[in-house]
A protein has these predicted regions:
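N-terminal auxiliary segments of SAM/dcSAM-dependent transferases
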Residues: 1-19
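Class I SAM-dependent methyltransferase Rossmann-like catalytic core
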Residues: 19, 23-54
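Class I SAM-dependent methyltransferase SAM/SAH-binding core
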Residues: 65, 71-120
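A conserved beta-strand element that flanks and buttresses the S-adenosyl-L-methionine
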Residues: 131
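A short, conserved alpha-helix within the catalytic core of class I
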Residues: 139-150
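Conserved beta-strand signature within the Rossmann-like core of class I S-adenosyl-L-methionine
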Residues: 155-164
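C-terminal alpha-helical "lid/dimerization" subdomain adjacent to the S-adenosyl-L-methionine
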Residues: 164-208
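Conserved Class I S-adenosyl-L-methionine
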Residues: 197, 201-233
Length: 233
């Protein structure tokens, strides 16, 4: 039953995507999302990819754009990563929600911030690397294909997507865990929808082929995918 239940991506809306959500509710949800990312090692795939890219290219400075940056927690981890490895990072967060910018500033997120739809950025905008985490499952397939092509054009050295795997086990785990830990109601509501909107390896193969973007598709524990280019010259 579970296999057929999650066979195709859901199009059910997440509350976090609702612009009517107030700033206080949004910030509360972001705090609990950061907690979930921390206990599930959700930052590790992106930071390991940055390690590989720096080792391959030899660069000692990087401009980084985080798309769908939320409260800036990934940018804060990348800032710490850069300091620990002696890599200068110029960080930019991008999120279309004004509440995200306010939450990121309140949390002390370093770098610049852009409140806009990513496709509204200037055509000549370029960054050394573009990353996103738990963002692509918010997009319908057609917009995701467009996003893959967009990153290929706008990233000098490479890009990396870090997102969920659609499967019954994480769905059940999040349904139980978010309730047992009494997390924010928006997180409780959205967590299982996020899994249902997420991707399988077959999805990623189809979508990257449609976009015409060569990419590495790698399984990440627990129940995540890393979709990335491994570094341009």
């Amino acid at each position: 039953m579970a296999r057929s239940w999650l066979r195709a991506r859901s199009d059910e809306a997440e509350r976090m995507d609702d612009a009517a959500q107030g700033e206080a509710a949004f910030r509360s949800a972001l705090r609990d999302l950061e907690f979930l990312n921390r206990i599930s090692f959700g930052y590790r795939p992106t930071l390991r990819w940055l390690d590989r890219l720096v080792a391959r290219t030899g660069v000692r400075s990087l401009s980084v754009l985080d798309v769908g940056a939320g409260g800036g927690d990934m940018l804060r981890r990348i800032d710490h990563w850069g300091r620990a490895r002696g890599v200068a990072v110029a960080l930019t967060g991008l999120d279309r929600s004004p509440a995200a910018a306010a939450a990121a500033r309140a949390a002390g997120t370093p770098g610049a911030w852009i409140t806009a739809d990513l496709f509204d950025l200037p055509g000549d905008a370029r960054y050394d690397v573009i990353v996103s985490a738990l963002f692509t499952h918010h997009l319908p397939d057609a917009d995701l294909v467009r996003f893959l092509r967009w990153m290929e054009r706008h990233a000098r050295h490479g890009w990396m997507i870090n997102d969920l795997h659609r499967h019954a086990m994480p769905w059940i785990g999040l349904w139980l865990g978010t309730r047992l830990m009494r997390l924010d109601p928006m997180v409780v509501h959205d967590s299982t929808i996020s899994v249902a909107r997420a991707f399988t390896r077959r999805d990623w193969r189809r979508l990257t082929a449609e976009a015409g973007t060569p990419a590495r598709i790698a399984w990440q524990l627990p129940f995540r995918w890393a979709i990335c280019t491994e570094g341009k010259a």
